[in-house]
Amino acid sequence: MSLPNPAALISQMAADLNAHLAQRAISEPRFIGIRTGGVWVAQALLEALGSDSPLGTLDVSFYRDDFSQNGLHPQVRPSELPFEIEGQHLVLIDDVLMSGRTIRAALNELFDYGRPASVTLVCLLDLNAAELPIRPNVVGATLSLAAHERVKLSGPAPLQLELQDLAL
């Protein structure tokens, strides 16, 4: 399987996000990337949008519902939100949407900071494997992988996608 070029996806995502925000009459969204890949995608997306908006970062490690199964990630860092959440229009950005559990955890954490006016979900890739009813408003590409395959994003510059075979 050939993976898409992240730079080309980011360019199209910027156009799609602008259209989505315009349709909803959102003029000053607040951007938040989910560590680590989502932050890289958010930085590239802000650059493609020509935006100098501050970027918030979320580390959802403590909010995941599989925390007791997987344990604590060795590099947990605090979330950094340089703006209010209450009443704001948020653009939540992640690299890969698989089960939906990371996004659920991110939403739980965000609501601990306040009640946003809206949340627009942006993902570089949707792996079409959702376990929860979560879908991105803007997506770079949708892929279907075999059960033994995963996609890994490396970055921050350049962003590159790698297909990993867990069966090997």
Swiss-Prot record:
CDD domains: PRTases_typeI
InterPro entries documented for this protein: PRibTrfase_dom, PRTase-like, PyrR, PyrR_bifunctional
Reactions accelerated catalytically: UMP + diphosphate = 5-phospho-alpha-D-ribose 1-diphosphate + uracil
Superkingdom to which the source organism belongs: Bacteria
GO molecular function: uracil phosphoribosyltransferase activity
Catalytic activity, EC: 2.4.2.9
An individual GO BP term: regulation of DNA-templated transcription
Motif PRPP-binding in this chain: 90-102
Key words of the record: Glycosyltransferase, Transcription, Transcription regulation, Transferase
Role summary: Regulates the transcription of the pyrimidine nucleotide (pyr) operon in response to exogenous pyrimidines. Also displays a weak uracil phosphoribosyltransferase activity which is not physiologically significant.
NCBIfam families: PRK05205.1-1
Family: Belongs to the purine/pyrimidine phosphoribosyltransferase family. PyrR subfamily.
Protein name, per record: Bifunctional protein PyrR
Source species: Pseudomonas fluorescens (strain ATCC BAA-477 / NRRL B-23932 / Pf-5)
